[in-house]
Design a protein with these regions (language model features):
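Long, histidine/aromatic-enriched segments associated with O2/redox biology
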Residues: 1-330
Length: 331
C-alpha cells in the first residue's frame, strides 16, 4: 500500500494568503461532503492559468463537523479549541467547522479560489475571512522576523505528520489558528532594546538573545518546549500579517500545524497561563487574541475519497440500537 499523501502543509510561505473559516449550515452535510472532493480540481483549474503563482490550499475539519460529515473513526486528538484564561490574558474559543488555508504568489488567484470553494461548499457561512500578506523579509507588523524556528526537511515531516500513534490518520496533522490584534501605539513607544526583550530575539538581524539576556516571560522563552527526554518539540507556523489602516487594525494571523495537538496547546498554555503559572507571555501586553479554532488536516487521499456520511438516527431501521456508531468515539 502506498504511503498516504499529505496536503501541502509544508509548502513554502507565499506573499499572499487567505484564511477562510466557515461553519456548516443545518442540513448542509451532504453538499459539503460532496464539495470536499471537488477542491483539488478547483486548484488545478485555477492554478493551470499561471503555474508560476503556485496556488495551493490546505483543507482542515473541526471537531463538531467531523461527526456530521464522516462515519467511522475520528482523529485521536481532535477536539474543540481549548479556551484559556490566565486572569490577565485570555485566548477565546470561536466557531469553525472548516478551515481553508489558501496560498499563492498573488492575491488574485487566492481570491478566485476562495470564491469557488465557498460556491462548491454550498450551505456554509463564512465566520472569519483574513487576507494575509508578506511583509518585507517575512516580518510581522511588530517588525520582527516570524517563523525563524520552523523545522525543515525530515524534521518538518516529523513535526507535522501523524505516524503509528494513530494509523487510521497517518500523514495528517492538527492545526490551531488565532487572530491577534496589536496595539501599535503602545508597541512603538518601546525602545528597540525593550522590544527585543519582549520577543527574545534581536530585531534587525533576527538572532536569539543569550539566556542571560532573555527574560523568562519573553515570547521565545515560553514557546520553546521539550519532551520528557529533553528533545525540543516543534510545530510549523505559517503566520502572516493582516490589517486595515482606516480601521486601525494591525494584526498577525497565527496558524500552527503539528503532529500532536498537545504540543501547540502547551505553547499556548505557557503564553496565556504561564510557565510557571503567572509568568505569562510579555507580548500579550501588546497583542490580543480575538479568535481561536482547532481543526484536523487529513491527507489528500482522505479528501479525494472520504468515508461516507454517518447514518442519522432517523435513517436507521426501526428497532436498530446503532451499536456500531460507538466505534472510534471517545469514551
Amino acid at each position: 500500500m502506498p504511503a498516504p499523501l499529505p496536503q501541502q502543509v509544508l509548502a513554502p510561505l507565499t506573499p499572499a494568503a487567505i484564511f477562510l473559516v466557515v461553519t456548516i449550515d443545518p442540513g448542509g452535510e451532504q453538499a459539503v461532503h460532496d464539495g470536499l472532493g471537488d477542491i483539488a480540481g478547483l486548484v488545478r483549474a485555477i492554478g493551470f492559468r499561471d503555474p508560476s503563482k503556485h496556488l495551493s490550499v490546505v483543507t482542515s475539519i473541526g471537531s463538531a463537523a467531523w461527526d456530521r460529515l464522516f462515519s467511522g473513526p475520528r482523529p485521536a486528538q481532535l477536539h474543540p479549541f481549548i479556551a484559556l484564561d490566565g486572569g490577565r490574558h485570555r485566548a477565546p474559543s470561536t466557531p469553525g467547522d472548516l478551515l481553508f488555508h489558501i496560498c499563492a504568489e498573488t492575491m488574485d488567484v487566492c481570491f478566485e479560489l476562495a470564491m469557488r470553494i465557498v460556491a462548491a461548499m454550498g450551505p456554509v457561512t463564512v465566520v472569519d475571512e483574513t487576507h494575509g500578506f508578506k511583509f518585507f523579509d517575512n516580518r510581522d507588523l511588530l517588525g520582527f522576523v516570524d517563523g525563524t524556528e520552523n523545522p525543515d526537511g525530515p524534521l518538518a515531516d516529523s513535526a507535522t505528520q501523524i505516524g503509528v500513534e494513530d494509523p487510521d490518520f497517518a500523514g495528517g496533522c492538527y492545526v490551531h489558528v488565532q487572530k491577534y490584534l496589536h496595539d501599535m501605539t503602545a508597541w512603538n513607544a518601546l525602545s528597540t532594546e525593550e522590544q527585543e526583550r519582549v520577543i527574545g530575539r534581536t530585531k534587525l538581524d533576527d538572532i536569539e538573545l543569550d539566556d542571560a539576556a532573555k527574560p523568562a516571560n519573553s515570547h521565545l522563552a515560553l514557546n520553546v518546549i521539550d519532551d520528557d527526554e529533553g528533545n525540543e518539540l516543534k510545530i510549523v507556523r505559517h503566520n502572516m500579517p493582516f490589517g486595515q489602516i482606516g480601521r486601525g487594525e494591525f494584526g498577525t494571523y497565527f496558524i500552527g500545524y503539528s503532529r500532536s495537538a498537545a504540543v501547540t496547546e502547551r505553547m499556548l498554555s505557557n503564553m496565556f497561563i504561564g510557565s510557571p503559572p503567572g509568568t505569562t507571555d510579555h507580548i500579550l501586553e501588546f497583542s490580543t487574541a480575538i479568535t481561536g479554532s482547532m481543526f484536523f488536516t487529513p491527507t489528500q487521499d482522505f479528501l479525494d475519497d472520504p468515508p461516507p456520511l454517518p447514518v442519522r438516527s432517523s435513517d436507521r431501521p426501526t428497532g436498530s440500537l446503532a451499536i456500531g456508531s460507538l466505534k472510534g468515539q471517545p469514551q
